[in-house]
């Protein structure tokens, strides 16, 4: 219906509009806070730092996202190729824009990015990177949103859990708490930021795999308190009916999701192995990253992190908060809907 020049013209116009919209948004935030105050340092559980500060390129007017100071590449799998940082940036920019624009390359036209070579965010060839996509990306996102004074930390992790043997394998990511902001409380039991996965239905899970799902519930009071509360994480308990190898790749087990503007931190996550030893049960904290051989009857309990709160808790009253916040209808059971709507 349209020739190529017309189509290309529309495509360029969409990107031009996105660039102008993001540029206006950045100008507003910088005018409000001052570019010198838009900076943040956060850490992975192993202590690796992710540093961000903004500055302006005086020659072309672009805003520079400078990650200088970020830790060197790590001797683990949390290294993140630089494309992951770009993905986190474009995601955050689109989230901060309050206009209806499609996500496209124009969103990052008004910015430049500086990432140190051989760092956690731009590792050398040959470095392990599987955790960079599912863990480090979440920390980069938290760092950007905090630097812009937009939102407290979310759970900061995908809670990657796998198990299997030579005959089968299973992989899931587990929801947690969303961080609060200046205008709303965080949502409980939700996949946050750099992930869009959905967990297997309980009935399907138990039918197709040799497990019993003993518990999958909201982890009460795990979100940080505040004028607006962080969302709660979840509790997931799986009992195995045959011996398998189980692995967990997770973050926010050592460093809690931070609150903002006086809001309290969310609760750290915990991964437990309930091991049968004779007629006794051992409770073992397996840490954020582990691989264990579980026996029939053993259980793995994963408590995911809550989101950070926003604002001084003393300023919070249920009545005033409900006037300010429109709670979404919670997915799932009536019990979860009640928690989301009224608690």
Describe every region a protein language model picked out.
Residues 1-343:
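Glycine/proline-enriched, intrinsically flexible loops and inter-domain linkers
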């Amino acid at each position: 219906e349209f020739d190529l020049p017309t189509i290309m013209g529309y495509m360029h116009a969409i990107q031009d509009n996105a660039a102008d919209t993001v540029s206006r948004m950045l100008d507003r935030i910088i005018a409000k806070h001052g570019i010198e105050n838009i900076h943040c340092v956060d850490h992975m559980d192993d202590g690796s730092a992710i540093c961000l500060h903004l500055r302006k390129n005086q020659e072309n007017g672009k805003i520079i996202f400078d990650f200088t100071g970020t830790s060197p590449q790590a001797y683990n799998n949390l290294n993140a190729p630089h494309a992951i940082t770009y993905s986190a940036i474009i995601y955050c920019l689109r989230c901060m824009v309050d206009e209806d624009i499609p996500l496209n390359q124009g969103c990052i036209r008004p910015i430049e990015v500086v990432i140190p070579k051989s760092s956690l965010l731009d590792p050398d060839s040959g470095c392990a990177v599987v955790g960079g996509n599912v863990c480090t990306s979440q920390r980069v996102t938290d760092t950007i949103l905090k630097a812009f004074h937009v939102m407290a930390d979310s759970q900061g992790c995908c809670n990657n859990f796998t198990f299997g043997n030579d005959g089968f394998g299973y992989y899931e990511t587990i929801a947690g708490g969303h961080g609060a902001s200046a205008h709303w409380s965080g949502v409980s039991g939700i996949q946050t930021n750099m992930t869009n996965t959905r967990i297997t239905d309980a009935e399907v899970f138990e039918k197709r795999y040799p497990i019993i799902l003993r518990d999958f519930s909201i982890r009460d009071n795990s979100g940080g308190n505040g004028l607006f509360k962080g969302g709660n994480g979840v509790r997931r308990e799986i009992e195995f009916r045959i011996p398998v190898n189980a692995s967990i790749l997770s973050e926010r087990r050592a460093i809690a999701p931070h609150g903002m503007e006086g809001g309290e931190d969310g609760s750290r996550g915990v991964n437990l192995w309930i091991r049968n030893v004779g007629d006794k049960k051992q409770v073992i904290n397996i840490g954020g990253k582990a691989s264990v051989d579980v026996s029939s009857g053993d259980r793995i309990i994963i408590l995911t992190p809550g989101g950070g709160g926003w604002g001084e808790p003393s300023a919070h009253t249920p009545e005033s908060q409900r006037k300010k916040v429109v709670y979404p209808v919670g997915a799932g059971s009536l019990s979860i809907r009640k928690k989301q709507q009224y608690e």
